[in-house]
Amino acid sequence: MGSHESLGPYFLVFLLLLLLPPPLFRAGSLRYHGPDWRIFHRLALGSRRAHHHHGPGWRQHWRQGQAGHRCQGSFDLYFILDKSGSVNNNWIDLYMWVEETVARFQSPNIRMCFITYSTDGQTVLPLTSDKNRIKNGLDQLQKIVPDGHTFMQAGFRKAIQQIESFNSGNKVPSMIIAMTDGELVAHAFQDTLREAQKARKLGANVYTLGVADYNLDQITAIADSPGHVFAVENGFKALRSTIDALTSKVCLDVTSVEPSSECVGEPYHVVIHGNGFQNLKKRDEVICRFIFNESTIIDEKPTSIDNNSMNCPGPKLEKPGEEYSIEVSLNKGKTFFKSNVSITSTTCGIFRNWLYFVPLLLLVPLLLCCVWRLCRKQTVKEPPPVQKPEKEPEQEKPPSPPPPPPPPPPPLPPPPPAPVNTCPTVIICCCGCQGVGGMRRIEGNLDTFCDLSHASCHQVPWMCCQSRDQGRYLSLALAQSQYAQAPCCPRICFPHSQECLSLPQAPCSPRMCLRHSRECLALKQARCSPNICLRHSQHSRECLARKQAPCSPRICLRHSPEYFSQAQTLCNPKSCLQPSRECLPLTCSSRCRLPPARCLRPPSRMLPLLSPLLRHTAEPPLSLPPSEPNF
């Protein structure tokens, strides 16, 4: 369900985008000036012509091809046709060409005139825009029988008479199409050139059409320009191929104007689209005329011109609702062709076109919905403490006091009591092993301490370094007498140097660390009486007898923290010498085993003493005077 809800706003945006193009297209801002639709019609027309055959229905097939460009301009059209004897039986093809061309000009503002020439000129149809009279003129034209010479100048004289008679007051452009099928004689050609020039002075545009045995140079000289010349090489049957091109050039009309409305008081340009703009002779002779009424007429020069359009600056509009029509002149105002389009002034501003507001009105609820969804997500995700900074700007006068420090964490619970050790660890604090003398033989052994402490410990050998006083040894007689009935895990203190010897009952790994000498104590693996040798120098070798040792540890004494490995036993006492941080591991003969060796911790750390629970059961330490050891 969540995925469908998230796609909803995007689907609405897509629908709104589909609604945006119609106002833009109505405004004309996205107009596409591509190929005219007439091109496709001409293609269809050509295909129909390819299947045309003379017969009972040949006229019907001919007229079916009259669906080309329909000129809607306002001008006068003159046909000057050659009916000399050289035309002979081809007159019917010439007539059909005229009939189809006339059908392309359907505007009621177009007047037509049919003139024939041979030895003399003849006006078959005087200039008129009446459809019935034009139809009657075509019927008369069909009945003509060609004969005589080719004197084209006679036909131009008849056309000039019509121009002077019907176009004296109204400045309407005149289009003359002069057709010939042969070459003109010299004097006829010269006379024709003079008559054609007279017609141009009256504002006429001259086109020439040559068929069969024409002279291209002659018809080009008679026409206004090479672009006004049409030549047919394949005889009269091919005249129909010139209809589309001739109609588009001869026709003078305005098809559309952009824009259709303009803002009041703002400068703008008018783009005029139409046909026949290629008939201009000079660019500076083109005039765009804007007619508001009979008394208000504004002429402007175009800024750009091509064959189908021109761009002219539009007149200033002073009030809304004004309307004007457009006329175009290609011969410096001699004649103008009118258009059926007009431009209306409107009030400019944001409310110019209400269609633009339809998408905006639809977007407003969508935007509100999106904002509400975003705000809702933010309020859900934001934790309550985030709102504190919002209250800070309100308290501007007094600075807020710093928050109180957090309460200290609760004390950690005391560690669980250590397990009860069944065998003690002896910590002997001597005066230190430093000195030149090294260690000497110690009288007695530590069996006494094991016997005093607990009955389960038997014959535990003990060791101690020599005191700072050379040749002095500790005596265990007093300790043996006073600690005959002591429980296990006692603490024994020697007041000479305040060192203590503790015997915890736990299986441990014996470790020994001695400094300031490089003596090693080798313990051979034997069932009893191993020798412990401490090498202090090359001249002295002291040995310490160890009874009933089931294992063979090694003891190394060096100037830096030394380590030695010894068998791990359940009864693993440890001797620590406080002044020099030396430790001597002791083994219990009855419970010794052989685990892997370990290294002693740094010399600055002491072995742990008895646990707090066992300290209550331990007897107070026994003080031994320093002067009682035996020598």
UniProtKB/Swiss-Prot annotation:
Q: Which residues lie on this side of the membrane: Cytoplasmic?
A: 375-631
Print the keywords alphabetically: Membrane, Metal-binding, Signal, Transmembrane, Transmembrane helix
Residues annotated as binding a divalent metal cation: S84, S86, T150
Q: Where are the transmembrane segments?
A: 354-374
Q: Where is the composition biased (Basic and acidic residues)?
A: 388-397
This protein's record includes keyword Cytoplasm: no
Under the heading InterPro entries, the entry gives: Anthrax_toxin_rcpt_extracel, VWF_A, vWFA_dom_sf
Q: Where is the signal peptide?
A: 1-27
Q: Where is the composition biased (Pro residues)?
A: 398-413
Q: Topology: which residues are Extracellular? A: 28-353
Ranges where the record places region Disordered = 382-413
Regarding the membrane, this protein is recorded as: Single-pass type I membrane protein
Task: State where it is primarily located.
Answer: membrane
Q: Which family does it belong to?
A: Belongs to the ATR family.
Name the record gives this protein: Anthrax toxin receptor-like
Please give the organism.
Answer: Homo sapiens
| Gene field | ANTXRL
